[in-house]
Amino acid sequence: MSSRFLKISVFIQKYRTPLLLIGCGGVFSANIFYHIFPDHTYKKVYQAWHKGEPASLSEKLQNIFQEVLKDSSISTSGNFSAFAAFGFHPVGAGVPWLPSGAQIGIPANFNSSTADLEGITNRTILINGKELEWDSDSGVALKNSLVFSLEAQKFAIAREVARLGSGGPILHAAVAPVCLAGACVYSVALKQIFRFQAGSIIFRGVVNLLSLGLGVMTYVLAADSVSQWLDYRSDRRAAGLSRDYAKGGLEFYEKILTRNKTLRSLMGQKGEEMYAPSGNLFPAHLLQLRHATYTSRRDRILNLLKNENV
């Protein structure tokens, strides 16, 4: 057993650089895979269905989508395509300059207006196993939080266009391989500092474990930082298109916060565990805050409006 372990250690030491390159390439490929083929991965997961068939995007939303691409100065609109998605706000995946392009899912409630709520009230929503009554006080509050003005709809789509158009998926996918390479650098540096290169295999193993721990911690912090930076940047780019877009962004986040507060009340204890009193999402893990909070994103757009930076 010990001889086999020794052979593996010698092999890793001998081919350390090629193995590191293969490992980093594999991790990057795994993270970017669904962005390379969004038609066959992301779209299939988020596609909305109606009567057993994929729902089609309405002409109204197709026109809004094209307007956003034009406002965003996207010269090759063929690299972006939209589909009808489930949920209550747009989602997106893909890399626009790759052959498969980028896919942006637009939810059915974007078809709704204060005069026509069909995209919302024709859904059955179960909360704690009970069907939500849209005519109840909570139902009316939730319904109102799901109706967005044209400006808010355009902002929500524009932020996805900005995120994908600026290479957000590639930046996020690059975090893990960079941290993996960093863990190897930690290991080599610590061994040289404490002169463990030719020392006991036990000490080297401890150093490797310590380096791995540092790499994991670096990844957690870096992944969150990159995600939040991308969130803020896409918001700023979308809000910077015009003052109407910025006002739409303010409305969009205000209504998300209102929706979450309503759901917190409706869901009882589970809602209190999921949503903060402010309407922000509680992080899934203690040390992770994957995305920027809704209140901070709203406040940044409000500052843009106050400072006339749009």
UniProtKB/Swiss-Prot annotation:
Plays a role in the early steps of cytochrome c oxidase subunit II (MT-CO2/COX2) maturation and is required for the stabilization of COX20 and the newly synthesized MT-CO2/COX2 protein. Residues 1-17, 191-200 are mitochondrial matrix. InterPro entries: TMEM177. Its main location: mitochondrion. It comes from the Eukaryota. It is found in: Mitochondrion inner membrane. Belongs to the TMEM177 family. The keyword Coiled coil does not apply. The chain crosses the membrane at residues 18-38, 170-190, 201-221. It is a multi-pass membrane protein. This is Transmembrane protein 177. GO terms for cellular component: membrane; mitochondrial inner membrane. Residues 39-169, 222-310 are mitochondrial intermembrane. Keywords: Membrane, Mitochondrion, Mitochondrion inner membrane, Transmembrane, Transmembrane helix.
